[in-house]
Swiss-Prot record:
UniProt lineage: Viruses, Duplodnaviria, Heunggongvirae, Uroviricota, Caudoviricetes
Gene: 21
Superkingdom to which the source organism belongs: Viruses
Protein's recorded name: Gene 21 protein
Amino acid sequence: MAKVYANANKVAARYVETRDAVRDERNKVTRRAKANLARQNSTTRITDEGYFPATITEQDGDVDFHTILNAPNALALEFGHAPSGFFAGTDTKPPEATYILTRAAIGGTVS
């Protein structure tokens, strides 16, 4: 019978080659996310030109490596939302989901 050690996952996750491979994959996701964000920023808007307070950053953890979308309402930017603010209560098409991080993570289009 095989023996499974309680800390085997922790040891494997902290192995240098594993960390390097995970970091490399995260870096690919970050590059794609920055490109997706740049494309989204080039669309028409109601805000001043050059005003797009969203950025893509990275964070290294003990085990995980993250690509992060920083924005005033990152969830609404990623997945869309109902009209609000100036457009609340109007017959306005809701902003489409941009899937900046989602498309970056899967490396393609969202079905």
